[in-house]
Amino acid sequence: MFLLPLADAQSKTVAALSDDIVFKASPVQEEAEQYLSRYLMQYHFRRVAVNDSLSQEILARFLEQLDETKSYFLASQVEQFNKETGKSIDDQFLAGKADAGFRIYNTFLSQAKKKMRFMIDLLDTARFNFTARDTFDLKRKDALWPSNSAEQQERWMREAKYQLLTLKYSGEEEDDEPRKVLKKRYENRLSLLEKQTADDAFRAYNYALTTSFDPHTSYFSPRDYEDFQIDMSRSLEGIGAKLQSENEYTVVNEIIPGGPAFKSDLLKKGDRIVGVGQNAGGEIIDVVGWRITDVVRLIRGKKGSTVRLKILPVSQANKGPSRIIRIVRDEVTLEEQSAKKEVIDHNGKKIGVITVPAFYLDFEGQKNNRPDYKSTSRDVGKILTELKKEGVDGVILDLRNNGGGALEEAVKLTGLFIPEGPVVQVKNARDGVVVLRDEDADVVYDGPLAVLVNRYSASASEILAAAIQDYGRGVIIGGRTFGKGTVQSILKINRPFNFFYKNNDDLGQVKLTVAKFYRISGESTQHLGVTPDIIFPSFIDSKVVGEDTYTSSLRSDVISPVRNSEPTRLTVDSINALRKRYNERLKTDSLYARYVSDLNTLKSFRDKEVISLYEPDFKADTDRIQGFEAQWNKEDEPDLLLKESAGIVADIADLSKKSLIVGGEAAPWQTRRK
């Protein structure tokens, strides 16, 4: 997906560009491209064969990020791109050239502006018929490119009808008439397109080039890197979320643990923000087509004030209907990110719940040997000691929505539950493998344990969950994890022998994938993630969230296991016994039955490839989705997964007392992972 740039001071003074403007790479950009190609070839974990296949991959990725829904380019234009550049991008890559990218981007700009003007005129003049049995194709990714302008414009007209119906039945606080709102969106988008520069073309092409190696590799121009360090961190003030632009939309890229958005549990990674309103009754301003800096300016505000966000939820594959959420602005502090505990009752058994939003570490405090410095492992260790004193029958470690953090803390936290031993393996691009171990033989807690995960549990969370699973130390419950099992490093692009150069312009930075994580079993968490022992259905759409949704993600592979002689507590038979009890409970759980029914309704909506533009049918679908989403987003709605997990931990405690959960001398992965 194409990431539109953060605005800079210069963009405000750029005059509207005519469609015949042709962008070309500057000398500094050409030089940066030369070094970028060398860095990718020399340092990236993936060894890429530079040939015509790479040319095709980069071209396909570039066309997809510019025009994923096949809305701008015609088939004849794509054919010309393939003829001109389909077998030469690899040669340009080795030569450090970006000519192909600039040519394609120039055509994209012309076509995109053409569409925006068409849509604006259409909304001014057309009379739309919503009683006809028309349909709109939602999944255009695998469709053919339009063969001519007439076919293209027919699709544009259907798109306008779909957008108008979506706005009409968005459900809440739509002050303006849908046609007016939609026209303004296209005007905003056109304005943004007319302010594009050669820097934007260079950025877009290099995004396609670098993400062809893997989705976490990227190039930062000097301005981009400043935005990466400063502007995006400033955007945390207010709601605690990182945002990025994808075409005309502002998209949530990350939810910061402990922040207002995290605590509200209403905003998710991948949600599109289409409107922003202030306080309880302020106007919802449509922000589709806005520059991201302007959107951030609306979202930020005084601590304690309320911001209302109109979103297209990722849970509905961003198709709509939209939903309005309310978040109270606040600061994000380390204290808010800290692990927290509660004790819940399950049929007379006390179950301790430890919520870990992130793997945090006060590096400065650790470096200076402060006795009270904060870290995940230290905080959780204290909580476990408290829970033991309170006499809990079992513990749940909740890692849902935990995107990772300090690797050191994942290793130390695992060590609270196991004797000393290997936790994770790290392999670099030269096939060197380092084993990270828990060096502390003490076990803080050795009782019944469950680890909760979901699709947003990533990186360090997956390392801990995998280790607990491979040791047979606890049961993993929830949904398959994200699958982020790689390590990135940011390198500054430097000229060799820089003192020979008169031009000392900054060439930017490159973020490279340089290593992969592997379980002690030898399997990689990359791409596949961690599959729970007991799977719980989820509202999260695994088709749009997760490492395996990226076509260029590094695949999972296997290296040698790390042998260890520690016995496993939970064998295959133990897990099967827990599953049996769990499934028996679900048969009589009416809340779970309603949950599954609503999930099936949502899944059928997500999987729709074609949607009706016949207004009564469209409204009926929208009402049904809004109804169950409103139910499950109530603040007082029970945490169903936590409730079921408490039952499973209680089962572990019960089976342990009956000596039905026993250890074994074989390596855990030989016992558990058959």
Feature-to-residue mapping (PLM):
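Polar, glycine-rich mid-to-C-terminal structural blocks
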Residues: 460, 472, 477-545
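Conserved functional hotspot residues or short segments at active or partner-binding sites
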Residues: 122, 172-184, 516-673
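Boundary at the C-terminal end of the N-terminal hydrophobic targeting segment
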Residues: 9-11, 15, 180, 196
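Cleft-lining beta-strand/loop regions that shape enzyme active-site pockets
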Residues: 24-25, 38-51, 191-198, 217-236, ...
